[in-house]
Swiss-Prot record:
It comes from the Bacteria. The gene is rpmC. This is Large ribosomal subunit protein uL29. It comes from Chlamydia caviae (strain ATCC VR-813 / DSM 19441 / 03DC25 / GPIC). GO terms for cellular component: ribonucleoprotein complex; ribosome. InterPro entries: Ribosomal_uL29, Ribosomal_uL29_sf. GO terms for molecular function: structural constituent of ribosome. The lineage of its organism: Bacteria, Pseudomonadati, Chlamydiota, Chlamydiia, Chlamydiales. Belongs to the universal ribosomal protein uL29 family. The keyword NAD does not apply. One of its GO terms (biological process) is translation. The keyword Ribosomal protein applies. Keywords: Ribonucleoprotein, Ribosomal protein. It holds the Pfam family Ribosomal_L29.
Length: 72
């Protein structure tokens, strides 16, 4: 729980450009994880799928808060 709050605090300190880069990095990592699971038949750490998706959602929420679309 503390790690989530720490991540949210770090995300709120970032600028919109940095948030966009963070989202892009996480989407890229999620895509490569999906490709690895589908193509290489390797054992993939399944918890990483939800971690990346949640990080993307958190950062997009913070981005919308900064743009004024969400009251926060």
């Amino acid at each position: 729980m503390a790690a989530k709050k720490k991540l949210l605090a770090e995300l709120r300190e970032k600028s919109l450009v940095e948030l966009d880069a963070f989202i892009h990095e996480n989407k890229k990592a999620l895509f490569s994880l999906r490709a690895e699971a589908a193509l290489q038949n390797k054992v993939v750490k399944k918890h990483l799928f939800s971690m990346y998706k949640k990080n993307i959602a958190r950062s997009m929420t913070v981005m919308q808060e900064k743009e004024g679309k969400i009251d926060g």
